[in-house]
């Protein structure tokens, strides 16, 4: 399923692969379950958004390229569900400012 996901939605595939790499297969499996359980694209995107929001603390543990993929997936979620856009924008801004402050 991971390889198929990488072809179908590369950014989400990147996030799933990285979660497995950092030994968080449980969260990767939740994302795959959201894909499998959705009968419509809205259900799939909504389920993925819920999983990523519930586990947003993992964002600090992933690589920069994967963080960019995570942001791209969340951008897709926010396009589908615009109510969360402002919240996600603020979260991304906070992360960027935090990373800049931590970079020597």
What are these regions (language model features)?
Residues 1-104:
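C-terminal-biased regions
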């Amino acid at each position: 399923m991971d390889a198929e996901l990488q072809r179908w939605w590369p950014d989400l595939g990147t996030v799933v692969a990285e979660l497995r790499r950092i030994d968080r297969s449980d969260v990767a499996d939740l994302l795959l379950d959201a894909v499998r359980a959705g009968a419509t694209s809205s259900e799939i995107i909504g389920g993925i958004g819920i999983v990523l929001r519930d586990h947003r603390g993992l964002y600090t543990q992933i690589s920069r390229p994967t963080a960019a993929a995570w942001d791209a997936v969340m951008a897709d979620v926010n396009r589908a569900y615009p109510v969360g856009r402002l919240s996600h924008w603020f979260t991304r801004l906070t992360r960027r400012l935090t990373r800049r402050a931590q970079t020597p």
